[in-house]
Amino acid sequence: MAADESPASPSELSECFSAEDYAAESLAADLDPWITFDARKTPRAEFSSWLQSHRPSSVSRYGDGEAGAGPVGWIAVRGPDYSEQSGDVEGLQDSWETLLTSGRSVSFQNIRELALNHSVLDGKWLMHLDTGFKVDRAWESIARATVLEGKIWSAKVSPRDPSSNSRHVICVYNQNFTDEEQVVRLDSAIRAAGVKCVLYYKPDVYTYLGIYRNNRWKLCPTIYESMFDLESVPRRSHILNKVTNLELS
């Protein structure tokens, strides 16, 4: 899984930071140690105690020297059907450099073509939550749906950053961002877990290519937005394709 968006929500991110700043921050988190529960390797009987011991609001991003705890990049869970499939990232980045030097326009369609050519197809729904009860409750629901129910492939959450006012980000993954039905099914699984907040969907190819907020190509860093409608019967998500500006039916 690649590094992701800042824990701050899109509306909170400062215009003074460049896409390169956000990419560097995310890469640093990705390279630091992760706390991971892998349902393929660890008995499920140990999951509840693991979950309680590693609540995102109580795990410090930069560790605790007095307690002998080191930095933590992410807290992650992997479901029983999880498999590593990052594709040909090096080839993707080489093709990206070729595109940039060719003079061709940079667009979602061109990037989608690169992703398909190099099998870099993972994507994730992102949610931004305040530290404390809100993030701990949402993370517990997502993690249980991943490890115990197998409804979600994999997920991760950022630990608490005591040095800033940034919120936590939870990333919930699927295997193919070009499969619209799969993207919608993952949204449904997240909503079934009890999450009602706004969600944003980002393909991993954007992350690998450094496409964050304030990028020089002026691309929106997310391609779907999901708003949960509490008043509809039955309750449902309204998912907007931000590339076409059309709502998914």
UniProtKB/Swiss-Prot annotation:
Superkingdom assignment: Eukaryota
Database matches in InterPro entries: Bles03, TIF_eIF4e-like
Pfam families: Bles03 (PF08939)
Family recorded in the similarity comment: Belongs to the UPF0696 family.
Protein name: UPF0696 protein C11orf68 homolog
